[in-house]
Amino acid sequence: MSKIILKTSRFLLKSPVEEDDFDQITKIKSDPLVSNTQLYGKVESRELCRFMFQHYITDARITKTRRKRWVFGIYPLEVSSTFPSICYIGNVGLSKKNVKSDTANLFFEIGPLYWGMGIATECVGRVIEFGSENNIQNFIIDPIIGNEASKKVALKLGFEDSGTFVTAYNGLQQHIYKLSKQIRTG
């Protein structure tokens, strides 16, 4: 299994997540504050969560040359009053449509206890660096309409509003934000 560890000044980002993380993953994904802003909707049990998101672990079994998706669990580096334990607090994912694509979608979620602390911006930024190091030149963030926090993260990271809206598989509207190599280096 291929393990990847990234760091920011405050967080460790690990791919794959650990099996033991699924209790916390379920807690976050079943919180209406989170699930109401995500395409997957409400997750009502650990078993359903594990079934729906097993790729958080199994993608790491795919060889580097064939891999097209990475999900990084976010873990605080240090225990503090804000982070009383070193445990899973959210994730950032990177997904290409196919192995040869130079474009990837980013997705992310943070437990509501940790909103407003710049965690998503910091960790998504680090995953963009990882993607760039792995020949991804263009990035897309596509929050559902009404997910203002994800929109703010995209804009803080330099993404441009494409003015495009798409309808997802479940009928929800998504707003497309793009970040290209030209924007990052321009």
UniProtKB/Swiss-Prot annotation:
It is found in: Cytoplasm; Nucleus. It is an enzyme of class 2 (transferase). One of its GO terms (molecular function) is acyltransferase activity, transferring groups other than amino-acyl groups. SUPFAM superfamilies: Acyl-CoA N-acyltransferases (Nat) (SSF55729). Its main location: cytoplasm. GO terms for cellular component: cytosol; nucleus. The keyword Transferase applies. Keywords: Acyltransferase, Cytoplasm, Nucleus, Transferase. Residues 12-184 form the N-acetyltransferase domain. Its EC number is 2.3.1.-. The keyword Acyltransferase applies. Belongs to the acetyltransferase family. PANTHER family: GNAT FAMILY, PUTATIVE (AFU_ORTHOLOGUE AFUA_3G00765)-RELATED-RELATED, MYND-TYPE DOMAIN-CONTAINING PROTEIN. This is Uncharacterized N-acetyltransferase C18E5.08. It comes from Schizosaccharomyces pombe (strain 972 / ATCC 24843).
